[in-house]
Amino acid sequence: MIIGYVVGSATTQEANVLLEKKVRSGYYVTLEYDDEKVLGLVTLITTGSPLVDDSLNDIELVQRIKQMGNKIPIYMKAKVKLLCKLDGKLSQPDLPPVAGTPVRLATNEELSTIFSEGTIRIGKLIGSDVEVRIRVNALTRHLAILAATGSGKSNTVAVLSSRLSEVFGSVLIFDYHGEYYESEIKNLNNIEPKINPLNLTPDEFATLLEIRENATIQYRILRRAFKSFLEETKEKLKNGNVNYNELNNNFRNLILKKVDEVSKNEKRKDSKDEVINKIEDFLDRYSEIIDFTAGDVVDKIKIGKVNVINLSSLDEDAIDAIVSHYLRKILTSRKENKMKRKIGLKFPVLVVIEEAHVLLSKDSNTLTKHWAGRIAREGRKFGVGLIIVSQRPKGIDENILSQMTNKIILKMVEPSDKKYVLETSDNLSEDIVEGLSALDTGEAVIVGNIVRMPAIVKIDKFEGKLAGSDPNLIEEWKKAKEEIEEHADVLNWGE
């Protein structure tokens, strides 16, 4: 179906089209010229009238023209980004289209050859029934899922994760808000956020206790105490003289004893006291995540499963320590497997980090940022893919975001976020980024190696419940009122 004709001057990258049919941004079109077919993407729609243009300054004249009703001539124009030749190779057009070139909607067959040849389905092209299937192998080059709040990030993560598990993929979600832990995702494997201190580094333990490196004396005391505790305990392990349940019960006393031993020569008693306070405060708040009986975290990750770690009850520092600990263990274990084969994590893992602007902030040096950066640089070689999720892209470390070769970007309105995403992306153009604010909820731009061409997609709706779904306030108020009244009736019964 012809929707319009090329007008004015054009380039091999872009053409202006005078429309005779209504279309919207995100539709794919085909231009046939120079004995070739070229695929284009509508990136902008404008409308106007030659009678009522920008040069008109007389309000009374506008009112008189308005009274003419349907007689006012109106035009619609589209800006079309020329993507590639439909020649099998998807090569760039050699020549621009000439004025008068007909423009039609691309057929499902033309679009399917480009967008439906991947491994797993993620949704459909906007304005068509053409499946969009992404290339799973390309996820080792990492993925960013970015959007404004409420635009469909969680739905996208749920759909992507569940589809990956169906092809025996292993996904690990660090569930910041508890959205997936009690969801209806198939192949769910919930993992308790337990940490065995014997597997921690002194830096990770210090972060858990909120002792920063710039608190030099406190940091030194804790490092020495924890290192001494680890060495002594691991020596006992070799000799079989360790009872793990006793370690759980006595950890507080054992580590405080070590603090006392290593700080005897410290002149500032207040630093020692502060370390003791930090340890006691941490163990009072988070004793449930410290468990000497907990096995290696890597052993809990299952293949063909959506593995979920619920972090919703923890604060940012505890989350940082846990996430960084898991990232370190996963990368190290995959390296061991690649080098020695028979040990380490035996299958690739895709790791999902939510609230990336917090854990991978450009303004703070978190432990998670260090290990996520390592995975962004090295993970591809060892089968560890990173998927970062955020509603504040401008807050993410640019070195990490720029290494997310693939991006799924849902509705985004904030100009500074769009500008930052454009600056940190090699495969995004300004016209596509500008169109992000026009997307509806659940619609996304997909770019990178996971698709052959930029795809404007309606992401599939996750068929199930997510704990993070918006509450129905009216229904919850009504239910609470009924329960209160029912309880009052019981209390008043027999009076």
UniProtKB/Swiss-Prot annotation:
Belongs to the HerA family. It comes from the Archaea. Changing K153A: Lack of ATPase and helicase activities. The keyword Transmembrane helix does not apply. The lineage of its organism: Archaea, Thermoproteota, Thermoprotei, Sulfolobales, Sulfolobaceae. This is DNA double-strand break repair helicase HerA. Gene3D superfamilies: P-loop containing nucleotide triphosphate hydrolases. It catalyses: Couples ATP hydrolysis with the unwinding of duplex DNA at the replication fork by translocating in the 5'-3' direction. This creates two antiparallel DNA single strands (ssDNA). The leading ssDNA polymer is the template for DNA polymerase III holoenzyme which synthesizes a continuous strand; ATP + H2O = ADP + phosphate + H(+); Couples ATP hydrolysis with the unwinding of duplex DNA by translocating in the 3'-5' direction. The gene is herA. It comes from Sulfurisphaera tokodaii (strain DSM 16993 / JCM 10545 / NBRC 100140 / 7). Forms a hexamer or a heptamer. Interacts with Mre11. InterPro entries: DSB_Repair_Helicase (IPR053460), HerA-like (IPR008571), HerA_barrel_dom (IPR018538), HerA_C (IPR033186), HerA_central (IPR002789), P-loop_NTPase (IPR027417). Involved in DNA double-strand break (DSB) repair. Probably acts with NurA to stimulate resection of the 5' strand and produce the long 3' single-strand that is required for RadA loading. Has DNA-dependent ATPase activity and bidirectional DNA helicase activity. Loads on either a 3' or a 5' DNA tail for subsequent DNA unwinding. Can also unwind blunt-ended dsDNA, Holliday junction and splayed-arm DNA.
